[in-house]
């Protein structure tokens, strides 16, 4: 497999800067395999080991679409819903969206079961 850079994936400039800020230098194999088709609007099923960048593999294309769609989605409506099997994974995915989307001026919420409504 060729050595790609995040710049070659044609991410929105704000996302590319966020990726650089996180210290990511080159995309992982799962990111190379999934980001381009997801950015084209195609469906993808990906499978990779823990710690290989799967969250970025789907979060970056989602955030890219939000960043580049015109007009921007309404601030009063949900644009994306990510479901995870555990609270811990939900928190990790939420943190990733927050980090990657920081320069996009987006709002995100984390909701999970097993606790009262107000702590969330």
Q: What is the predicted function of each stretch?
A:
Residues 2-120:
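SF2 DExD/H RNA helicase N-terminal ATP-binding lobe
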């Amino acid at each position: 497999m060729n050595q790609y850079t995040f710049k070659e994936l044609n991410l929105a400039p704000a996302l590319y800067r966020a990726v650089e800020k996180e210290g990511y230098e080159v995309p992982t194999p799962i990111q190379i395999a999934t980001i381009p088709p997801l950015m084209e609007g195609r469906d993808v099923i990906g499978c990779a080991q823990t710690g290989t960048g799967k969250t970025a593999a789907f979060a970056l294309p989602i955030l890219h679409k939000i960043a580049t769609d015109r007009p921007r989605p309404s601030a009063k409506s949900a644009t994306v819903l990510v479901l995870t099997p555990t609270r811990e994974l939900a928190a990790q995915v939420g943190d990733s969206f927050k980090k990657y989307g920081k320069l996009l001026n987006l709002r995100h919420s984390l909701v999970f079961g097993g606790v009262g409504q107000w702590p969330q």
